[in-house]
Amino acid sequence: MAELIIVYFSSKSNNTHRFVQKLGLPAQRIPVDNRPLEVSTHYLLIVPTYAAGGSDAKGAVSKQVIRFLNNPNNRKHCKGVISSGNTNFGDTFALAGPIISQKLQVPLLHQFELLGTATDVKKVQAIFARLKHHTHDKQKQTNNLITERTHPCHKPMRHTSH
């Protein structure tokens, strides 16, 4: 199977971290400090939302996530985004997800509140499994295509004149 991991950001409150731990899936955390993280495999991004609510969407995506996604290599491996938020903030609930989805042109796969529920955990595990299977199928198709084009028995046909 093609490798797929969870990449996530969690502030010092660790709400997102606790949610990711419940998933029981391979994961890498975007550092809270300024240390860079570079990912070389496909991943599903899980991020919290930081926004004041109402019409104030400033800062919805954390600086650490922005810095991570400013790396072209990291951007190209993102296969989808999941975001968390607090429904008390109304229109800005889980807003980081739609923002990142639009910027990266990847699907917004799920949104959940705070620590998430058992149902959220099951949904994200199912999304991960489907995405991993889909990524595997695409990789298999690509490998078959490469094999078909580069196999030594596949030589160009020569035209001979009589």
UniProtKB/Swiss-Prot annotation:
GO molecular function, a single term: FMN binding
InterPro entries in the record: Flavoprotein-like_sf, RNR_Ib_NrdI_bac, RNR_NrdI
GO BP terms in the entry: protein modification process
SUPFAM superfamilies given in the database record: Flavoproteins
Pfam families per UniProt: Flavodoxin_NdrI
Role noted for this protein: Probably involved in ribonucleotide reductase function.
Family of this protein: Belongs to the NrdI family.
Record protein name field: Protein NrdI
Gene responsible for this protein: nrdI
